[in-house]
Amino acid sequence: MEETGIKSIVIKEICDIARKYNVQKVTLFGSRARGDFKARSDIDLAVQGGDFIRFMLDVNEETSTLLKFDIVNLDEEIQNELRESIKKEGKIIYEEI
């Protein structure tokens, strides 16, 4: 996932937190998924299933990055354009099998 500018340890931490809170799927989207990010671009995540609030809090507090996160709950209503964008350009970084 280095092409996203996100260190592999941070991806692992996100996956561990997803597992901890029974999240079904985490998708990276936005500039980091497209590859047109800047050094300080935030990390956009779309989340399905599990305890969204606790996942979001832990990702913001317990990952070893100073980058900001923008986390969207796909189990709630979001703009159709955003949902389509996530579907089109998103990269799945965690999926419960």
Predicted regions and their residues:
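Catalytic core of pol beta-like nucleotidyltransferases
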Residues: 1-25, 33-39, 48-97
